[in-house]
């Protein structure tokens, strides 16, 4: 079945180790230049003699052969064993012992290998293996098998197996290079970890003498007899060889960094070597135990060497199966710089920058602008930074009142309105049955009047233009008009049966609302003392009444939780001519006949039923036409905004306490609210965001009364704690003198109240 010569070669004894050494010498003498690797797809003949083995250049292996042919002082074979290669050789018993002794110069490494292989003879049959040899758990790898297969001439008894293994190994190399490129290591295939610790470029403190060949062989045939070999076997545990229960892999101290420094004093040589190599002995014995844990000892060697002579430096590229001999490209240089960014401060070559944790710098506005990468803004980064700069801080509002006045006998009644501030900067206050005036300019206090009926004052209201006439409502239903300069009562207006809770001026029209659920319009130019119109729309007493700034709409709030909006054009009705004057009031008859009430009755334009408590707080915005704000009582606690041009609700906010009063600032788009149960606070709101600007406290009881100064900066609040407090809440207005000029104009023109 077998050829006779072939069978003879198969049965011939194996060559002695000495022939292997001669092989190396012959190899070096016959190949002074760098050998050209054979094509990977060509199989070597199984009928070659011993001399033909010299042509086998061991393509695509990672063996460093460094020979000095002139003096033969040292033959240095750098055997950097890569754990990422597995050979399909079955071994029954393998014992390998490697001992490294801490010697400064020179360093001697003794390796004793005893191998008893057992092979299966397949004859002339060719049995293919799978592509990934390292993925086969039935095959184990050891250094002796690698040495026989790739370093020595082929043995006739093992030719078939070796040729098959070499071909598959070459195929694996080509396949991986096609997948990863020549610049990547095969460690990416063999390591099961998701984090790869590999060095693509040489990171050691040695010189790279790679002359564009696959075998890293640097033969310096010079007359200098000094050879300095720095063989760094840095495997760094980046190879994870699969093991199974039947075969254990022998780990022959591949993690030790050993620098062999041989110095021959034949020429003048200055070599400074500081080598600190701890003694490390690793015995890895395979006794077919079902133990897959390999003993691995890692020794870190720090070497500082200064050579001033010709140095032959042999450096393997850190376990790369295929050495990278091309000049690094720009991309590779950047990657190398990234991986070596920590080597300047640390002599340990095992520290790679790519595996270091870098603290992320805190992002600041000066570094970059945190904006969307899909932003379509045409502004530059500098412009965006400028626009995104912080706004001016909110103005500071003092939480301490600028002035506190005693107000004894002031009523603690939610339905009353007992303070008002005139355009002439005079504050009117109703205290029990009397009315007092406080001049804010001179701080003088004067008493205006005492109610003739002896009934308490229920409401006060200054005329808007002129500022010298004050309307006073009493609990007897009578409204009197006083000239404050002369301290004289000009007129008395009748029409209400009970107390008058609210008063509102609209030029020469005085509107009053009372406990009798009706609203009466009086034209003060008419001396007949008759009301011009009567508005009926509430089911309970009226406690809030305000005209819009343009004088076209009137808002009223009552204890029936209703907010009504009245149109002034609809309420104007021509008075009947020759109407007899009303009869004098008596205890048995009403001041207004039933016929007159039916003739002058109007209905509201809008009626809002969203509040759940009495509506006393009402305020029209001076900045937006038709914007109305209203506040509910204890069971509502909400501020609601309305569009009176469309009759729609805009928004609402829960304040958390009873809303007693509302007032807009004419200088800024803000409003102030006063509250009762349960917080008794004063809050300034920003509109339309309705974010609180500030909250003020000081009153010990419900803040039932509110008035704003004519300049719009100061507000006065009153409470049942018998005190009046003045607060600076709003900024000044550059056009604040405009209202004063109007007042001066109307004062000169005069308003004839008869």
From Swiss-Prot:
Top-level taxonomic group: Eukaryota
The keyword Transmembrane helix is annotated on this UniProt entry: no
Region named Disordered: 1-30, 47-116, 200-351, 570-598
BP terms from Gene Ontology: anaphase-promoting complex-dependent catabolic process; cell division; positive regulation of anaphase-promoting complex-dependent catabolic process; protein ubiquitination
Claim: Nucleus is one of the keywords in the record: yes
GO molecular function: anaphase-promoting complex binding; ubiquitin ligase activator activity
SUPFAM superfamilies given in the database record: WD40 repeat-like
Compartment(s) where it occurs, according to its Swiss-Prot or TrEMBL record: Nucleus
Protein name, UniProt field: Anaphase-promoting complex subunit cdh1
Subunit structure: The APC/C is composed of at least 13 subunits that stay tightly associated throughout the cell cycle: anapc1, anapc2, anapc3, anapc4, anapc5, anapc6, anapc7, anapc8, anapc10, anapc11, cdc20, cdc26 and cdh1.
Signal peptide positions on this chain: none
Record-stated family: Belongs to the WD repeat CDC20/Fizzy family.
Pathway(s) it belongs to: Protein modification; protein ubiquitination
Gene3D superfamilies linked to this entry: YVTN repeat-like/Quinoprotein amine dehydrogenase
Keyword terms of this UniProt record: Cell cycle, Cell division, Mitosis, Nucleus, Repeat, Ubl conjugation pathway, WD repeat
InterPro entries, sorted: Cdc20/Fizzy, WD40/YVTN_repeat-like_dom_sf, WD40_CDC20-Fz, WD40_repeat_CS, WD40_repeat_dom_sf, WD40_rpt
Organism the protein comes from: Dictyostelium discoideum (Social amoeba)
Biological role: Component of the anaphase promoting complex/cyclosome (APC/C), a cell cycle-regulated E3 ubiquitin-protein ligase complex that controls progression through mitosis and the G1 phase of the cell cycle.
Stretches with biased composition (Low complexity): 50-116, 202-325, 340-351, 587-598
């Amino acid at each position: 079945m077998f050829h006779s010569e072939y069978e003879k070669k198969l049965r011939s004894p194996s060559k002695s180790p000495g022939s292997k050494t001669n092989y190396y010498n012959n190899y070096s003498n016959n190949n002074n230049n760098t050998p050209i690797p054979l094509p990977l797809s060509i199989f070597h003949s199984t009928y070659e003699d011993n001399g033909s083995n010299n042509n086998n250049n061991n393509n695509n292996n990672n063996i460093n052969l460094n020979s000095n042919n002139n003096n033969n002082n040292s033959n240095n074979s750098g055997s950097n064993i890569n754990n990422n290669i597995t050979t399909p050789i079955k071994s029954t018993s393998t014992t390998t012992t490697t001992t490294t002794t801490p010697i400064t110069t020179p360093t001697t490494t003794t390796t004793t290998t005893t191998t008893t292989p057992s092979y299966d003879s397949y004859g002339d049959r060719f049995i293919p293996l799978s592509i990934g040899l390292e993925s086969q758990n039935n095959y184990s790898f050891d250094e002796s098998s690698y040495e026989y297969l790739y370093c020595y001439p082929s043995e006739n008894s093992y030719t078939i197996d070796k040729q098959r293994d070499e071909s598959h190994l070459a195929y694996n190399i080509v396949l991986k290079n096609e997948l990863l490129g020549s610049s990547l290591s095969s460690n990416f295939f063999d390591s099961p970890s998701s984090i790869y610790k590999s060095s693509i470029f040489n990171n050691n403190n040695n010189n790279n003498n790679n002359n564009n060949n696959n075998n890293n062989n640097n033969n310096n045939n010079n007359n200098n007899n000094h050879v300095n070999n720095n063989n760094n076997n840095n495997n760094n545990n980046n190879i994870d060889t699969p093991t199974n229960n039947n075969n254990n892999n022998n780990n022959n101290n591949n993690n030790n960094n050993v620098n062999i420094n041989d110095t021959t004093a034949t020429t003048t040589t200055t070599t400074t070597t500081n080598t600190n190599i701890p003694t490390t002995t690793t015995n890895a014995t395979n006794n077919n135990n079902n133990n897959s844990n390999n003993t691995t000892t890692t020794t870190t060697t720090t070497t500082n060497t200064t050579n001033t002579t010709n140095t032959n430096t042999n450096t393997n590229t850190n376990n790369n199966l295929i050495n990278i001999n091309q000049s690094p490209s720009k991309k590779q240089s950047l990657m190398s710089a990234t991986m070596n960014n920590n080597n300047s401060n640390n002599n340990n070559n095992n520290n790679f920058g790519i595996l270091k944790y870098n603290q992320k710098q805190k992002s600041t506005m000066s570094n970059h602008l945190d904006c969307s990468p899909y932003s379509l803004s045409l502004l530059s980064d500098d412009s965006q930074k400028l626009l995104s700069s912080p706004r001016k801080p909110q103005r500071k509002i003092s939480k301490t009142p600028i002035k506190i006045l005693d107000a004894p006998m002031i009523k603690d009644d939610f339905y009353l309105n007992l303070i008002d501030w005139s355009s002439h900067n005079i504050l009117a206050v109703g205290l029990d049955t009397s009315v007092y005036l406080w001049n804010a300019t001179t701080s003088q206090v004067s008493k205006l009047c005492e109610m003739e009926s002896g009934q308490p004052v229920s409401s006060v209201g200054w005329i808007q233009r002129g500022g010298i006439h004050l309307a006073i409502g009493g609990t007897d239903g009578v409204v009197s008009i006083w000239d404050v300069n002369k301290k004289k009562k000009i007129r008395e207006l009748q029409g209400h049966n009970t107390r008058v809770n609210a008063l509102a001026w609209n030029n020469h029209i005085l509107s009053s609302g009372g406990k009798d659920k009706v609203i009466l319009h009086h034209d003060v130019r008419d001396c007949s003392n008759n009301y011009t119109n009567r508005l009926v729309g509430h089911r309970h007493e009226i406690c809030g009444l305000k005209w819009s700034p343009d004088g076209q709409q009137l808002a009223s709030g009552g204890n029936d939780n209703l907010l009504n909006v009245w149109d002034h054009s609809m309420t104007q009705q021509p008075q009947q001519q020759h109407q007899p004057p009303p009869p004098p009031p008596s205890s048995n008859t009403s001041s207004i006949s039933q016929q007159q009430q039916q003739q002058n009755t109007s209905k509201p334009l809008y009626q809002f039923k969203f509040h759940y408590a009495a509506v006393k707080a009402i305020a029209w915005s001076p900045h937006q036409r038709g914007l109305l704000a209203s506040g509910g009582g204890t069971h509502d606690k909400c501020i609601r905004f309305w569009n009176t041009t469309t009759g729609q609700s805009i928004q609402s906010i829960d304040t958390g306490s009873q809303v007693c009063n509302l007032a807009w600032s004419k200088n800024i788009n803000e409003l102030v609210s006063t509250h009762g149960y349960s917080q008794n606070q004063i809050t300034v709101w920003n509109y339309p965001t309705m974010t609180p600007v500030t909250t003020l406290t000081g009153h010990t009881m419900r803040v039932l009364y509110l008035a704003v100064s004519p300049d719009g900066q100061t507000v006065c609040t009153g409470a049942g704690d018998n005190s009046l407090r003045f607060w600076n809440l709003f900024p000044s207005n550059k056009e604040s003198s405009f209202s004063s000029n109007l007042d001066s104009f109307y004062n000169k023109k005069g308003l004839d109240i008869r």
